[in-house]
């Protein structure tokens, strides 16, 4: 079973790249906004939205982990490396997928802020993520989180056997996904 965790700052390309990697391995993609966008229209964008989203995600992970015939899952998310609770979140995911048959791949994406700001308003992103359609709010969230949190790791900070960090600033989603697919196939 392949568990592919794709993380990085907002608008780095996690969902688009994750879709292509998912197609290559015939794995479903649970991108960050699937659960968030199902909740926020009803209760707003607040702490409860994130709490409920996490409950749904963990329920999905537990179901997948128990099903030995399941091929796996791709999950995309933002990891704030300066927040201990995010490290705890990763620990919980690792505890759920703790069988020897579970292969967890950690893929970190990075891109410079100007490129992420450009990607933040692409037609495809706005089509797939309703909460990003308020461009002003989305831009503010992206830039504020970049100032407030460290959304990419330091060198050697992520201590996982199957870990790849990829700067996608000047790569297309296709080029990025091909590099990730090749890396997974060699691990």
Region roles according to the model:
Residues 6:
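Hydrophobic anchor at the beta1->P-loop junction of P-loop NTPases
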Residues 122, 126-175:
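Small-molecule kinase domains that catalyze NTP-dependent phosphoryl transfer to phosphate-bearing small molecules
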Residues 57, 61, 173-181:
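Short, amphipathic alpha-helical "lid/cap" segments that border enzyme active or binding sites
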Residues 19-65:
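Conserved substrate/cofactor phosphate-moiety recognition/catalytic segment
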Residues 52-108:
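Glycine-rich phosphate-binding loop used to anchor ATP phosphates in small-molecule kinases
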Residues 98-120, 166:
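Conserved phosphate-donor/acceptor-positioning beta-strand/loop module used by diverse small-molecule
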Residues 14:
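Conserved lysine of the Walker
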Residues 10:
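The conserved Walker
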């Amino acid at each position: 079973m392949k568990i592919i965790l794709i993380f990085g700052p907002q608008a780095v390309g996690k969902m688009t790249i994750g879709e292509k990697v998912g197609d290559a391995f015939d794995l479903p993609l649970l991108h960050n906004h699937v659960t968030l966008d199902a909740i926020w229209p009803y209760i707003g964008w607040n702490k409860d939205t994130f709490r409920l989203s996490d409950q749904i995600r963990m329920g999905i992970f537990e179901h997948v982990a128990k099903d030995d015939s399941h091929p796996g899952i791709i999950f995309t998310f933002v990891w704030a490396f300066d927040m201990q609770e995010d490290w705890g979140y990763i620990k919980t995911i690792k505890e759920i997928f703790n069988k020897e048959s579970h292969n967890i791949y950690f893929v970190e994406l990075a891109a410079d802020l100007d490129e992420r700001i450009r990607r933040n308003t692409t037609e495809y992103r706005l089509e797939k993520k309703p909460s990003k359609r308020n461009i002003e709010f989305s831009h503010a969230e992206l830039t504020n989180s970049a100032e407030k949190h460290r959304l990419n790791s330091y060198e050697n900070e992520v201590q996982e056997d199957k870990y790849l960090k990829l700067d996608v600033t000047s790569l297309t989603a296709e080029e990025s996904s091909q590099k990730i697919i090749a890396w997974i196939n060699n691990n």
